[in-house]
Amino acid sequence: MQVPAVLGEPIRFVLNWGRRYSLWVFNFGLACCAIEFIATSMSRHDFMRLGVIPFAHGPRQADLMVVSGTVTDKMAPAIKRLYDQMPEPKYVISFGACSNCGGPYWDSYSVTKGVDQLIPVDVYVPGCPPRPEALLHGILRLQEKIAAEGAGVGGVSRPDALASPTGGAAPRSADSLTAPLVRPPTPS
């Protein structure tokens, strides 16, 4: 069922306005960037004034997942599972060099070269670790993106380039990232 064009634009505006100013955040903090996330949520920077509510009880109550820190291949299935538990529409901010591209550990055998290999990322915040102001800037960019979204039936669908068969490379499955156990050689 399509919303008539006359009603569609005002409804889309209201839905996107509500989404953009009531983001419940689920922080997946893995390293020092998580400390900067906590600093951003404190009273000095106060991202609640932007409509961002920190510390959702879990992924099922969250709209926004902030992945901060080094993502290892062993942690990848947990990130993928938590992302899948989030209700639509869901957004992801990759916060810091480690979650963007592996950071200083990019050449390690066990480090995923960016969280975007696992889940679609909406905003990248660079830095090692990024300052709280950088996260605030990333949230503002995400809110601009939400305001420009088209809403589908029920107002929750959005095009996802990584999920579509024609757009971009598909993210790796979490199962492909689980390495077999490494056993020490047996003495002979």
Swiss-Prot record:
Chief localisation class: membrane
Any single GO BP term: aerobic respiration
Known catalytic reactions: a quinone + NADH + 5 H(+)(in) = a quinol + NAD(+) + 4 H(+)(out)
SUPFAM superfamilies membership: HydA/Nqo6-like
Location in or out of the cell: Cell membrane
Binding site for [4Fe-4S] cluster: C32, C33, C98, C128
This protein's UniProt keywords: 4Fe-4S, Cell membrane, Iron, Iron-sulfur, Membrane, Metal-binding, NAD, Quinone, Translocase, Transport
Region of interest called Disordered, as start-end residue ranges on this chain: 153-188
GO function term, MF aspect, one: quinone binding
Keyword Transport found: yes
Source species, domain of life: Bacteria
Cofactor(s) of this protein: [4Fe-4S] cluster
A cellular component annotation (GO) from this entry: respiratory chain complex I
Entry-linked Gene3D superfamilies: 3.40.50.12280
EC identifiers of the protein: 7.1.1.-
Enzyme class: translocase
Cofactor note: Binds 1 [4Fe-4S] cluster.
Membrane topology: Peripheral membrane protein
Role description: NDH-1 shuttles electrons from NADH, via FMN and iron-sulfur (Fe-S) centers, to quinones in the respiratory chain. The immediate electron acceptor for the enzyme in this species is believed to be a menaquinone. Couples the redox reaction to proton translocation (for every two electrons transferred, four hydrogen ions are translocated across the cytoplasmic membrane), and thus conserves the redox energy in a proton gradient.
Quaternary structure and interacting proteins, as annotated: NDH-1 is composed of 14 different subunits. Subunits NuoB, C, D, E, F, and G constitute the peripheral sector of the complex.
Stated family: Belongs to the complex I 20 kDa subunit family.
Protein name listed in UniProt: NADH-quinone oxidoreductase subunit B 1
Organism: Salinispora arenicola (strain CNS-205)
Lineage of the species this protein comes from: Bacteria, Bacillati, Actinomycetota, Actinomycetes, Micromonosporales
